């Protein structure tokens, strides 16, 4: 398992719905506030908007916020990559920025593809081909040797530059 950077915690995700109306629990003056999500991925934008819908704040993509950056994700951990993205956008906007980095880490092959999940075997390689390659590399692995996890780090940079990071992992086994 990848070491967890200082300030990042592995935890189980609480999927319980609030027992009260949460619209109004957050920030009194939402009219001028917004959140920028450091991604160009339309699927991720749909997901994050659904997750944050109770805040009553607009959640903008980089493009919608007028941010044009080619961010190099050269961190060695999911936390480092998420922070690199969030800080790059925050430096341009000064507002609240969220970024994530996620991927699959397979123990038998040394934690690969890990932080390189999106670029594993090339960015234009389909997930079907990437998955087939991983399964082939696990041909001699049995039982718990096939252990893996999907890791997601979410990083927030607040208006004042404070950084908050959370990371969770979903443990499992790669099927044959």
Locate the predicted segments by residue.
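Short, Lys/Arg-enriched N-terminal segments with co-localized hydrophobic residues
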Residues: 10-26
